[in-house]
Amino acid sequence: MRKTAFLFPGQGAQNVGMGRSFYEKYDAVRQYFKTAQEVTGIDVASLCFEENEALNQTEYTQIAMYTTECAILNVLQEKGIPYEAAAGLSLGEYAALTAAGALSFKDGCYVIRRRGIYMEQAVPEGQGSMAAVLALSAKQTEEV
């Protein structure tokens, strides 16, 4: 017997056009984007589908990702695609909570909007940095 789990990505997986084919095909997806806009005041559809720099700003990326993930999840649920588990990487954990029924989409929009704002404020543009350490030994990692 096969089991299915949904894994939701975190920030960094966003790209212009994400979710567009679902948005164009399903009324329910458009409703998710409308709800996100009502809760946050952000035109999430424009954010996702039009070329812009805002999609790469934490303050906006997070609501765009969460909305897209939950809208697609809804389509999968409506199609009767069963799943036994949901998990997420960082931001994706919120979509996983929604998939599990622990967080409503509307409440999630509220939380994610604030999360994005606070994270953006914590590290203003041009300050701070991040590095990925790949294929180093433990000793080399300690030296870094």
Language-model features and meaning:
Residues R2-A87, L136:
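Helix-rich "cap/lid" substructures immediately adjacent to catalytic or cofactor-binding pockets
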Residues Q11-A13, E38-T40, A100-V144:
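Alpha/beta catalytic cores of group-transfer enzymes, especially the acyltransferase/condensing modules
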Residues Q31, A64, S90-L91, L103, ...:
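An amphipathic alpha-helix/helix-turn recognition signal
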Residues N52-E53, A87-L91, G116, G128-A132:
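Short, glycine/charge-rich beta-strand/loop segments that flank catalytic centers
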Residues M65, I72, E93-A96, Y110, ...:
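Hydrophobic side chains within alpha-helical segments
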Residues E69, E84, G88-G92, A96, ...:
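Gly/Ala-rich beta-loop-alpha elbow adjacent to hydrolase catalytic centers
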Residues V75-K79, L97-L103:
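Alpha-helix C-terminal capping segments
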